């Protein structure tokens, strides 16, 4: 499986099979705004909330893609949508 070039609706089975780049990490953008899956050279994959607040870019680790504390793509989308709603209400 190749790295996606643009935003994709990330599915668990596809995400587990995203290739590891031994030289650098990369991010896969989900179709849900501000949700990214970060793939590290070690093979570790985790969800990231990537947003701009008051002109400053922020990245918040949500949790791992697999393992005992795994966060599913659906749960990651729910979390980001909730945070985005709260962030917009506070503006």
Residues covered by each model-derived region:
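Basic/aromatic DNA-contact patch characteristic of tyrosine site-specific recombinases
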Residues: 1-91
């Amino acid at each position: 499986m190749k790295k996606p070039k643009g935003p994709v609706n990330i599915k668990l089975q596809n995400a587990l099979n995203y290739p590891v780049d031994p030289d650098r990490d990369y991010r896969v953008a989900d179709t849900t705004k501000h949700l990214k899956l970060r793939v590290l050279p070690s093979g570790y994959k985790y969800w990231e909330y990537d947003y701009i607040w008051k002109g400053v870019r922020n990245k918040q680790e949500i949790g791992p893609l697999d393992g005992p504390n795994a966060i599913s793509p659906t749960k990651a989308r729910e979390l980001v949508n909730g945070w985005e709603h709260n962030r917009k209400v506070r503006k």
